[in-house]
Amino acid sequence: MIEETLLEAEEKMEKAVLVTKEDFASIRTGRPSPATFSRITVEYYGAMTPVNQLASFQVPEPRMVIISPYDKAAMPAIEKAIRESDLGVNPSNDGNIIRVVFPELSEERRKEYVKVARNKAEDGRTSVRNVRRQAKDAIDKAVKAGEIGEDEGHRAQKELDALTQKYVGEIDELLKHKESELLEV
């Protein structure tokens, strides 16, 4: 019972780290990448579809992304979605491809993105801690019900705390890496 609780907690903590990693990928750095567009959705045949499922991406230059839609009919919708996103770019459409040139990030904008990254990291840490709290409650309930002994309950809580520290540490490492990436000129 306790092993199941700990395994479930670990899976949820891994998922929280993965979501944080995906959130970081969507934050623009000095170099654009296809992941920059992963959170942008387009209405395509009545369904909201991520841009990265509607087109292929190439990065021919450090500050340019070329988007080649699989369906040319989706081009205006993709262009509009990118223009209205919070990327701060103006895509140009030549009929076959969409070119997106990213301006250099100003120091102010870099610091803004660092704040966004810190907020996303804190959200991730909070998710991990919430998972810990839920698992701890389940362990406490099992001890009170007499399903497990107090010693086993304490051992399980120590394991849970170690898991929590491990995954919070992973999020902190991701944040440190993202901050250095953002502040690199």
Swiss-Prot record:
One Pfam family of this chain: RRF
Compartments reported by the entry: Cytoplasm
The keyword Protein biosynthesis is assigned to this record: yes
GO biological process, one term: translational termination
Main location: cytoplasm
One GO molecular-function entry: ribosomal large subunit binding
One GO cellular component term noted in the UniProt record for this chain: cytoplasm
InterPro entries the record matches: Ribosome_recyc_fac (IPR002661), Ribosome_recyc_fac_dom (IPR023584), RRF_sf (IPR036191)
Alphabetic keyword roster: Cytoplasm, Protein biosynthesis
Known function: Responsible for the release of ribosomes from messenger RNA at the termination of protein biosynthesis. May increase the efficiency of translation by recycling ribosomes from one round of translation to another.
NCBIfam families reported in the protein's UniProt record: frr
Similarity remark: Belongs to the RRF family.
Name assigned to this protein: Ribosome-recycling factor
